[in-house]
């Protein structure tokens, strides 16, 4: 699902807010979450999951085209850990292959 599809679903489901209001709310929420992670803070949404940063240590990688070794610096990457309610709900639903 894309961001615009999410906006359309919310507008259709609740019917009280305009598409522009829902779009602004989602953009604001995502911006705040991004800023929070950028400062190293953790985000927890009960029943859904938590977002945090994980550190990836420096390592030697390979250029897939040339096979040449490349030194990669250490970096922080966003990590999502689903909550128990989300895991349970996903496992209850029937999955249709894409």
From Swiss-Prot:
InterPro entries, per database record: Hist_DNA-bd, Histone-like_DNA-bd_CS, IHF-like_DNA-bd_dom_sf, IHF_beta
Keyword Transport attributed: no
GO cellular component, one term: chromosome
GO molecular-function term, one example from the UniProt record: structural constituent of chromatin
CDD domains: IHF_B
GO terms of biological process kind: DNA recombination; regulation of DNA-templated transcription; regulation of translation
UniProt family annotation: Belongs to the bacterial histone-like protein family.
Record's subunit section: Heterodimer of an alpha and a beta chain.
The protein, known as: Integration host factor subunit beta
């Amino acid at each position: 699902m894309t961001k615009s599809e999410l906006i359309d679903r919310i507008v259709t489901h609740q019917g009280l807010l305009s598409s522009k209001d829902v779009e602004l709310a989602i953009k604001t929420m995502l911006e705040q979450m991004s800023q929070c992670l950028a400062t190293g803070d953790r985000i927890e949404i009960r029943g859904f999951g938590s977002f945090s940063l994980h550190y990836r240590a420096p390592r030697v990688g390979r250029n897939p085209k040339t096979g040449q070794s490349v030194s990669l610096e250490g970096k922080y990457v966003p990590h999502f850990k689903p909550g128990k309610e989300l895991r349970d709900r996903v496992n209850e639903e029937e999955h249709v292959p894409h």
